[in-house]
Amino acid sequence: MENILFVYENQLPDNFSENVEKAGITPKVATPGDELSFDKIDAVAYFGENKDNLKTVVEKAVESGVKRAVYVASAICYFNRRNPGQNLEKHPFVKNQTDCENAILAFSDKISVSVAEIPLAYPLPKEIFTIGGVPALKCRNFYLTFDGGYPEIGDESAAESVLSVILNGKNGVIYPLCDKNAKFKSMLNEKYPDVKVYEFPEELWWVLALRAKSSLKKAGLTAKTNIKTLYKKDLYENYFFDDTEVRKALGYK
């Protein structure tokens, strides 16, 4: 297989390397300070810190004659494009992900670039109360969550989906991928079947927002997100998408 620049900024499933090696690709890890060489390797996995680091590594790949690049981005980029009025880029994570995605797509006239957008496991902001990684509040004998949700993807599906983009992705095309769309309440019911779960009324968002702000203040922390927007809108939004056509394009049934 030809040399491939494989770029991702978030942790991928443990079995990802095993899956891509079956396809004849051997991912190598490079950090921003490394001298990169593309003459004897099949792929490079690069942990970029920002769009400038990403541009640097892509430029090196192009200079070395690499013809193909695949970037793994967060599905949040999809929702940022779909809902421009929500201004999701106010959150630094969304801004960074979107900037990096746009930066690598800008090279599509010099190198074949495909993007895989998957729901990635990354730490939720400290401003959000969570239970088992799900936005929720623990009460005496029940859980309170929000009337929202987002797409999910399993480790095996994530590895297979990204591999499909590596093998079959077209230049300049973005592929949003997921297994299913899940609401916070259903995720908690699945994880904690013996605990009752209720959805916190949206009109009382300000109660939890004030509590979150107070908790941060006691911990000596400053909010990195707009808590008002977070609790008034974002946690009650269903960030769902249907990737049926995308999966068909990649060879899935």
Predicted regions and their residues:
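Conserved Rossmann-fold NAD(P)-dependent oxidoreductase catalytic core, especially the SDR/UDP-sugar
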Residues: 43, 56-95, 114
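Catalytic helix-loop patch of NAD(P)-dependent Rossmann-fold dehydrogenases
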Residues: 80-122, 141-142
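Residue-level signal for the nucleotide or nucleotide-sugar donor/cofactor binding architecture
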Residues: 95, 150-153, 241
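Amphipathic terminal alpha-helices
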Residues: 2, 17-20, 38, 236-253
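N-terminal Rossmann/SDR dinucleotide-binding element
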Residues: 1-43, 52
